[in-house]
Amino acid sequence: CYINNCPLG
């Protein structure tokens, strides 16, 4: 995940 995004769930 990133600071405010979780593309992997």
Curated annotation (Swiss-Prot):
Keyword Kinase: yes or no? no
Annotated localization: Secreted
The entry's keywords: Amidation, Disulfide bond, Hormone, Secreted
What GO CC terms are in its UniProt record?
Answer: extracellular region
The record's disulfide annotation reads C1-C6
Q: Which domain of life is it from?
A: Eukaryota
A Pfam family (short name) is Hormone_4
Which InterPro entries has this protein been placed in? Neurohypophysial_hormone_CS
- Principal localization reads secreted
UniProt keyword Disulfide bond present: yes
User: Where are the Glycine amide residues found in this chain?
Assistant: G9
Recorded GO MF terms = neurohypophyseal hormone activity
| Family per similarity comment | Belongs to the vasopressin/oxytocin family.
State the name under which the record lists this protein.
Aspartocin
Q: Which organism is it from?
A: Squalus acanthias (Spiny dogfish)
Organism classification:
Eukaryota, Metazoa, Chordata, Craniata, Vertebrata
